[in-house]
């Protein structure tokens, strides 16, 4: 079995042993504000006139997980449309899906939810619990929103279940101070933020030999941050997670098997079933780990414990594309926007569409809505909203590395669960070929059932 960072060690390193229960918290917080309905349609106008009330549940998408930020956005909406009461609940990625699924089963789903196509289209949309948003997708919207984003927001029948606001490229990060300390910065193209697979493995080896026992973690306690573990494995030798048509899962390819085995064999890389992506970030920031596979611009901008771009102790954090043999990294993209649960109340559905139309499409508002996310606009018309911000300007380089948005493949929810279970089995010593064969069998069975 590969070594792992124990749960107790994580809690001690994070400095929160006395608050361990917080890691198991299962509730979101909520807030209420008054906002108004749009006159985008007669139904919406009717909703406004009757004082329709809607519930928004949002995952922690940059500033959209911060109540002050969200209330400011709702206040802008309220200034134009003052008659709808909006209740906001903030979800997390540990328990949020369970909360939503429980609400769906109990007939109390929110009217609005903010997340990505893998949930809104491939999961809840496929289950028939979402209201189509086809009327919001006007010809002008389709021309303005990037085609790669638009294609992820509808199903194979052409029904749209997401209206997007922002996007980013997920990447990884290294403690550049420590990398330079062990002389491994020679393996990194600091202008392009790229490196070869050989260079990555050499960097891991140099850090390990330099006295850093825990260089990186293949975290697998759950699905949180799993885009990072998928990306490191797929990129190393040119593997894919699904086929190009998004009909089946392909983790059992020779390229993926080679990558998983290389990571398992690398000293300093630990398959850790006790942590998820968010906890990996904490360990990276406090110096326990020297690399993080769960990273994006929101993490790079985080200044909770030090200035943006620095670890807690002041070391330089350098964002990196995942290593490749080809020199052509394929990063997982994050697309976030809004979906509407069909709760059978047309007035609420139209009021929710009004909110979406204002926040994500109004030319006088959409820029501020994107800025609140700390991500990038999905609309060409929004332009450069980060002019003069050196960190954001540098991070735009990663957008050119965006790969296929495969998260809309049928069976996605099952595949995510099977993925971290597969990594756990590898960590206990199960042969990689056997572990990925089980993953593919179970994930593709789910894909077939949902197709």
Show where each model-derived region lies.
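Short, solvent-exposed loop/beta-turn-alpha elements that line the ligand-binding surface or hinge
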Residues: 134-145, 189-193, 216-219, 239-258, ...
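Extracytoplasmic/periplasmic substrate-recognition and gating elements
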Residues: 52, 75, 79-80, 85, ...
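Glycine-centered hinge/linker elements that transmit conformational signals in sensory
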Residues: 201-208, 245-275
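Conserved N-terminal structural module of periplasmic/extracytoplasmic solute-binding proteins
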Residues: 2-6, 11-122, 127, 138-142, ...
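Conserved C-terminal helix/tail region of periplasmic/extracytoplasmic solute-binding proteins
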Residues: 364-366, 373-383, 397-451
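Hinge/lid segment of periplasmic solute-binding proteins
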Residues: 43-48, 116-171, 198-201, 314-323, ...
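Short helix-initiation/N-cap motifs at beta->coil->alpha
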Residues: 90-99, 118, 194-199, 273-286
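Extracytoplasmic/periplasmic solute-binding protein
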Residues: 157-165, 170, 196-248, 289
């Amino acid at each position: 079995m590969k070594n792992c960072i124990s749960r107790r060690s994580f809690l001690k390193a994070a400095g929160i042993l006395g608050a361990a229960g917080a890691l198991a918290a299962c509730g979101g917080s909520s807030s209420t504000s008054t906002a108004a309905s749009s006159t985008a349609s007669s139904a919406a106008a009717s909703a406004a006139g009757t004082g329709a009330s809607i519930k928004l549940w949002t995952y922690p998408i940059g500033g959209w997980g911060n109540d002050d930020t969200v209330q400011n956005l709702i206040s802008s909406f309220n200034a134009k449309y003052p008659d709808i009461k909006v209740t906001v609940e903030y979800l997390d990625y540990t328990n949020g899906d369970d909360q939503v699924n429980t609400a769906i089963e109990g007939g109390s789903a929110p009217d609005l939810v903010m997340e990505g196509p893998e949930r809104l289209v491939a999961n809840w949309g496929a289950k028939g619990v979402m209201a189509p948003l086809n009327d919001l997708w006007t010809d002008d919207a389709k021309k303005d929103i990037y085609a790669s984003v638009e294609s992820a927001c509808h199903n194979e029948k052409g029904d749209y279940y997401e209206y997007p606001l922002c996007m980013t490229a997920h990447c990884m990060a290294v403690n550049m101070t420590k990398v330079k300390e062990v002389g491994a910065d020679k393996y990194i193209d600091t202008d392009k933020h790229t490196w070869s697979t050989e260079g990555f493995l050499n960097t891991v080896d140099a850090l390990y030999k330099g006295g850093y026992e825990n260089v990186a973690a293949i975290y697998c306690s759950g699905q949180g941050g799993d885009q990072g573990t998928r990306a490191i494995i797929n990129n190393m030798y040119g593997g894919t997670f699904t086929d190009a048509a998004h009909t089946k899962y392909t983790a059992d390819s020779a390229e993926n098997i080679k990558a998983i085995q290389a990571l398992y064999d690398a000293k300093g890389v630990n398959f850790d079933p006790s942590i998820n992506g968010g906890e990996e970030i904490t360990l990276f920031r406090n110096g326990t780990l020297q690399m993080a596979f769960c990273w994006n611009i929101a993490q790079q901008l985080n200044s909770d414990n030090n200035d943006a771009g620095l670890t807690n102790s002041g070391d330089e954090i350098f964002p990196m594309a995942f290593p490749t043999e080809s020199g052509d990294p394929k990063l997982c993209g994050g697309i976030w926007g809004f979906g509407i649960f069909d709760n059978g109340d047309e007035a609420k559905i139209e009021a929710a569409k009004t909110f979406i139309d204002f926040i994500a499409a109004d030319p006088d508002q959409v820029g501020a809505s994107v800025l609140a996310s700390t991500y990038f606009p999905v609309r060409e018309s929004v332009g450069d909203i980060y002019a003069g911000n050196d960190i954001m300007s540098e991070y735009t380089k990663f957008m050119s590395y965006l790969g296929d948005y495969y998260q809309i493949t049928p069976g996605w929810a099952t595949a995510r669960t099977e993925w971290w279970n597969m990594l756990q089995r590898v960590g206990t010593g199960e042969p990689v070929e056997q572990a990925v064969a089980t993953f593919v069998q179970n994930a593709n069975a789910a894909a077939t059932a949902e197709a």
